[in-house]
A protein has these predicted regions:
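Bacterial N-terminal signal peptides
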Residues: 6-17
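Sec/Tat signal peptide C-region and signal peptidase I cleavage site
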Residues: 19-22
Length: 245
């Protein structure tokens, strides 16, 4: 073996020979800084626990969704469009996409309280998440909601339990009876919206759907003629309103 080849073999062997690990070379444990300790865990949101689940991709304005009128206090035109799209999707029981639309509205106008109300509406079957979103709406009442929007948010506060499955007094109650009482309070609060805004057909539509849902846990529909009258008022103003679902 010539000298040049011997040198190459020696270098090759040294490269693969296990090197001793000195104490000072060992990886030191990462010290947790104040900044890192405040960061959310992977997959979690800076905005709060309720945002950890649900849609991740941004919403888009979908064509041919129909149209409704739901004025809000936002000055952002696209936020307004996403609010109305979210309500259209609520009427169609398209809850995931509805939450996505309301989330997009909140991204465009973070202080818009009614956007968080919409997220709560889209999660009525998940009281913990609904309460998280509703608390976000309530925290923005003074600066992010007009009088009418405040009525919607305060009405929903009657329906969503304050601390789902944690209130000891509620545990002693019959769950169905508790839901019935909350639904009755919600319907009463929604009717107050119509007292002040008698032309608000979205309030009428939401009352109708809540009456239908609440009937399952004991809130009796005492007059189907009254329900039909509400629907007729809705369709008289908007024949294509999604309440026909």
């Amino acid at each position: 073996m010539n000298a040049s080849l011997s040198t190459c073999v020696l270098i090759f062997c040294i490269g693969f020979y296990p090197q001793p690990i000195l104490a000072e070379d060992r990886e030191k444990p990462t010290e947790q800084t104040t900044e890192s300790s405040e960061d959310p865990l992977a997959g979690h949101s800076y905005h709060g626990e309720a945002f950890n689940e649900g849609p991740r991709q941004a919403a888009i304005l979908m064509p041919e969704m129909g149209s409704i009128s739901f004025p809000t206090s936002t000055e952002n035109e696209n936020a307004q469009r996403f609010i109305e799209q979210g309500i259209l999707q609520l009427h169609g029981f398209w809850y995931l996409e509805s939450e996505r639309s309301f989330r997009q509205a909140s991204k465009l106008d973070p202080n818009l309280a009614i956007a968080y109300w919409g997220m709560a509406m889209a999660n009525q079957n998940n009281a913990t998440r609904a309460r998280g979103f509703l608390d976000e709406a309530l925290s923005r009442l003074d600066e992010g909601a007009d009088e009418r929007e405040q009525l919607y948010i305060k009405a929903l506060d009657q329906l969503i339990p304050k601390k789902p499955n944690e209130n000891e007094k509620d545990k002693d109650k019959d769950e169905k009876e508790e839901k019935k009482q909350r639904a009755e309070r919600y319907l009463s609060a929604m009717e107050k919206i119509l007292d002040q805004y008698p032309e608000d057909i979205e309030a009428k539509a939401l009352i109708v759907v809540q009456m239908w849902m609440a009937n399952g846990y004991g809130v009796k529909i005492t007059s189907r003629y009254a329900v039909d009258a509400l629907l007729n008022e809705i369709f008289a103003k908007n024949p294509a309103h999604p309440a026909h679902h």
